[in-house]
Amino acid sequence: MVSRMVSTMLSGLLFWLASGWTPAFAYSPRTPDRVSEADIQRLLHGVMEQLGIARPRVEYPAHQAMNLVGPQSIEGGAHEGLQHLGPFGNIPNIVAELTGDNIPKDFSEDQGYPDPPNPCPVGKTADDGCLENTPDTAEFSREFQLHQHLFDPEHDYPGLGKWNKKLLYEKMKGGERRKRRSVNPYLQGQRLDNVVAKKSVPHFSDEDKDPE
């Protein structure tokens, strides 16, 4: 009698396992849910459509690819807000902020790029936001921007938060001008005849010529 009951229970358990059923006492937290990932994606897509942040996906089969004429463009980028990501639009999109060393960067006060001088045109003064009595030449512009890399407003002028063109111009006028080099030091000394440029015309001496 007991053996018959044991065999009946074992056969029932084997039938459950063969059918893919799991008894309640054998439930493990590692067992995946019966809801498929596709069902979850469809649910999330429906919620995002209700919120207005998901657009229906339009796909073109391979045989219709040649029917697309005219310029094609792709929208979306680093700073374009929420985007339609993933086949169901369910991939979370976070608008990233450009930072340096985890510190938000204020691009209005950026000192990373040189600021060219702004000489005053005829009839304008310094009150109009330009520099008076400055030479409007390319050489002065190069010198002006070169000094910006050496100019430290935080230490030289503690009250300033960004470049001050007027103070920089005053500093340039008071300092010693850099001497221009008119002689290239790399062209001095004895020339190496065995070193030739790649595009130079090959030179053959008379000794290398074949006797006629």
From Swiss-Prot:
Pfam families in alphabetical order: Secretogranin_V
Signal peptide: 1-26
GO MF terms, alphabetically ordered: enzyme inhibitor activity; enzyme regulator activity; GTP binding; unfolded protein binding
Name assigned to this protein: Neuroendocrine protein 7B2
Stretches for region Disordered: 174-212
Modifications made to the protein after synthesis: Proteolytically cleaved in the Golgi by a furin-like convertase to generate bioactive peptides.
Residue pairs linked by disulfide bridges in the UniProt entry: C120-C130
Keyword terms: Chaperone, Cleavage on pair of basic residues, Disulfide bond, Neuropeptide, Phosphoprotein, Secreted, Signal, Sulfation, Transport
Name of encoding gene: SCG5
Modified residues (Phosphoserine): S141, S205
Listed GO biological process terms: intracellular protein transport; neuropeptide signaling pathway; peptide hormone processing; regulation of hormone secretion
Recorded superkingdom: Eukaryota
Subunit structure: Interacts with PCSK2/PC2 early in the secretory pathway. Dissociation occurs at later stages.
Function: Acts as a molecular chaperone for PCSK2/PC2, preventing its premature activation in the regulated secretory pathway. Binds to inactive PCSK2 in the endoplasmic reticulum and facilitates its transport from there to later compartments of the secretory pathway where it is proteolytically matured and activated. Also required for cleavage of PCSK2 but does not appear to be involved in its folding. Plays a role in regulating pituitary hormone secretion. The C-terminal peptide inhibits PCSK2 in vitro.
GO cellular component: extracellular region; nucleus; secretory granule
Organism: Homo sapiens (Human)
Family in the record: Belongs to the 7B2 family.
Localisation: Secreted
Main subcellular location: secreted
Keyword Transmembrane among UniProt keywords: no
Lineage start: Eukaryota, Metazoa, Chordata, Craniata, Vertebrata
